[in-house]
Amino acid sequence: MDSNTVSSFQVDCFLWHVRKRFADQELGDAPFLDRLRRDQKSLRGRGSTLGLDIETATRAGKQIVERILEEESDEALKMTIASVPASRYLTDMTLEEMSRDWFMLMPKQKVAGSLCIRMDQAIMDKNIILKANFSVIFDRLETLILLRAFTEEGAIVGEISPLPSLPGHIDEDVKNAIGVLIGGLEWNDNTVRVSETLQRFAWRSSNEDGRPPLPPKQKRKMARTIESEV
């Protein structure tokens, strides 16, 4: 196993521990708590894949961070912070909408790279909107936290989420996953539109009503792809 992979996991575990202590003091805002919960799942998946104990890794990560801080001057820290571009966290969904459990009568699932696409194909003739929470840098989607499809009544009928064991995706991955989700939902005569935030940074639809321009052939192809890979 590559030593950089192990040490990266150890540092991530310790930094998550620090953030958790911060949140336990009720100091974190909604986006902070959002990322904390998602990163916990990611660390568990990585730990399982690597065969490493999280508690042991956290202790090792603490030693690595302490060694770095001992060598770090205040001036170097200021220069590092100034040179790193700042990302923005955008939210379509509330914390309740993100954390709510949901169930599917006819579950369909597809894994596309490091993203998992899930939908309930029992849903028919509904008006559906896609909402997402994600970070943006240089006016492009940086990291998808979670995307969900909601009916007008507020029911969750679809979802795109990063796989904890396979971190890392780009905006094109998210765009392709959105296309697959829309194709599957529109196969059952649902009307799907995308939130303004998603249109701007992830989908860039030219339609004024936020409906992505998917031709019928592409819809059918996407729906068949989901069915064939479940």
Swiss-Prot record:
First-listed, main subcellular location of the protein, grouped into a coarse class: host cell
Start and end residues of each stretch annotated as CPSF4-binding: 180-215
GO annotation, biological process: symbiont-mediated suppression of host cytoplasmic pattern recognition receptor signaling pathway via inhibition of RIG-I activity; symbiont-mediated suppression of host gene expression; symbiont-mediated suppression of host mRNA processing; symbiont-mediated suppression of host PKR/eIFalpha signaling; symbiont-mediated suppression of host type I interferon-mediated signaling pathway
Coiled coil: none
Region (RNA-binding and homodimerization): 1-73
Entry keywords, A to Z: Eukaryotic host gene expression shutoff by virus, Host cytoplasm, Host gene expression shutoff by virus, Host mRNA suppression by virus, Host nucleus, Host-virus interaction, Inhibition of host innate immune response by virus, Inhibition of host interferon signaling pathway by virus, Inhibition of host PKR by virus, Inhibition of host pre-mRNA processing by virus, Inhibition of host RIG-I by virus, Inhibition of host RLR pathway by virus, Interferon antiviral system evasion, RNA-binding, Ubl conjugation, Viral immunoevasion
Post-translational modification: Upon interferon induction, ISGylated via host HERC5; this results in the impairment of NS1 interaction with RNA targets due to its inability to form homodimers and to interact with host EIF2AK2/PKR.
The family this protein is said to belong to: Belongs to the influenza A viruses NS1 family.
Protein name: Non-structural protein 1
Lineage: Viruses, Riboviria, Orthornavirae, Negarnaviricota, Polyploviricotina
Record gene name: NS
